[in-house]
């Protein structure tokens, strides 16, 4: 039982570094359909989430949600719904440039002018 759990954890860590989350979650779902592997998959999902224990139904729900999240509507990456995601420098240039004219407060910046 622990060998399955260790294998799943190793695959989860590897998928985080390679970006193959969808393939890993599909494998989790395939292993979850086997009744003998269900406790190991539930424990692994719980450990990834940082909780102590998870019901089998909750684990299955989480896997299906993650699969839906990573696959997306058009099999796109998770950031593709942001506009101009392919040009991050466009925004960075406008921010780093700063305002065109630095505004300084007037010398006597009161609500009413000072009488002399």
From Swiss-Prot:
Residue ranges, annotated region (Disordered): 77-116
Native source species: Frog virus 3 (isolate Goorha) (FV-3)
Protein name: Uncharacterized protein 039R
Domain of life, per lineage: Viruses
